[in-house]
Amino acid sequence: MEAFAVAIQSVINDSGFLAFTTGNAIMILVGLILLYLAFAREFEPLLLGPIAFGCLLANIPRNGFEEGVMALISAGISQEIFPPLIFLGVGAMTDFGPLIANPKTLLLGAAAQIGVFAALGGAMMLGFTAQEAAAIGIIGGADGPTSIYLATKLAPHLLGAIAVAAYSYMSLVPLIQPPVMKLFTTQKEREIVMEQLREVTRFEKIVFPIVATIFISLLLPSITSLLGMLMLGNLFRESGVTDRLSDTSQNALINTVTIFLATGTGLTMSAEHFLSLETIKIILLGLFAFICGTAGGVLFGKLMSLVDGGKTNPLIGSAGVSAVPMAARVSQVVGAKANPANFLLMHAMGPNVAGVIGTAVAAGTMLAMLSNH
């Protein structure tokens, strides 16, 4: 009987209840709210769902995640394995044709990165270090894997808050962007009908990822793993002879890696890391970054329209953030409301895919400036 009592006491002592804190309770509530938003409201369910469940797991005391499969999942993020693999799948799903057909839209993708640097400046004004500010600023690029990649490099203690902000705002693009787009454009500008894009040859589509990889990687070697995998996936898509690799990259592989990446991100959301004033600042700075990025793209679109005599609809500039293809769809919806004959989707895909490259370049630039400081 005494042995039984000792065993019971041992179970009680080892249980998580004795180590359970108010912070754990709050974070489990946060996880439940995120699960509701993901599955009931369909806010980025493929990403917020696993992140939210990872948050629940991270706040179970004495969970033993220092070893075993959970440790390997966490290592996949800290060792920068998962983000490049996600980019491989993204590349296989991306059509760079609209960008190749209208190269000047690359400038719109670059202009939208103003949100990244505006948030960087704002974060430094709020007391964050340069490295932390850079990791926060990249939220404005609307690119979850790049946000996770840069946060892991520069501010791993902020990874959970940055990832949640990035993916939350990506899901809210249809709500955040239209008011900004309408604020900075006139009815006449929104009604502009753009000429149909030229047809892009297979040769151009094959050469583009090769040339882009060589040039950009030589310029910013620190993002070679991200950009290289993005372009490799695209090469699988466009070569015409690697259909199996392309199919695996854009389906089975990216789905599998997404589970591990998102769950591993959620595992960083322990109470001691997430419950702070900094988290609130990051959420607000993320919104500021999105608004500035959208405004920057639209304003540069207005400038292009002025220069080319009204051939460019400024609305496609908002697609310069790299939320693919959501931002391009928003441009299409807003343009169609202004002029039902308007079809901006393919035009907006140019700056949209340029934004993917632009965000990676912005991340590489900040890494080059800050990683050794």
From Swiss-Prot:
Enzyme class: translocase
GO biological process, one term: sodium ion transport
Keywords tagged on the record: Cell membrane, Ion transport, Membrane, Sodium, Sodium transport, Translocase, Transmembrane, Transmembrane helix, Transport
Membrane-spanning segments: 17-37, 38-58, 81-101, 106-126, 132-152, 156-176, 206-226, 257-277, 280-300, 343-363
Membrane topology: Multi-pass membrane protein
GO cellular component entries: plasma membrane
UniProt key word Transferase: no
Post-translational modification: The N-terminus is blocked.
Subcellular location: Cell membrane
pH dependence: Optimum pH is 6.4-7.0.
EC number: 7.2.4.3
Means of activity regulation: Completely inhibited by avidin.
Family assignment from sequence similarity: Belongs to the GcdB/MmdB/OadB family.
Oligomeric and partner information: The methylmalonyl-CoA decarboxylase is composed of five subunits: the carboxyltransferase alpha subunit (MmdA), the tunnel beta subunit (MmdB), the biotin-containing gamma subunit (MmdC), and the delta (MmdD) and epsilon (MmdE) subunits.
NCBIfam families: Na_pump_decarbB
Reported function: Tunnel subunit of the sodium ion pump methylmalonyl-CoA decarboxylase, which converts the chemical energy of a decarboxylation reaction into an electrochemical gradient of Na(+) ions across the cytoplasmic membrane, thereby creating a sodium ion motive force that is used for ATP synthesis. The beta subunit catalyzes the decarboxylation of the carboxybiotin carrier protein and the coupled export of Na(+) ions. Can also convert malonyl-CoA into acetyl-CoA.
Record protein name field: Methylmalonyl-CoA decarboxylase subunit beta
Organism the protein comes from: Veillonella parvula
Lineage start: Bacteria, Bacillati, Bacillota, Negativicutes, Veillonellales
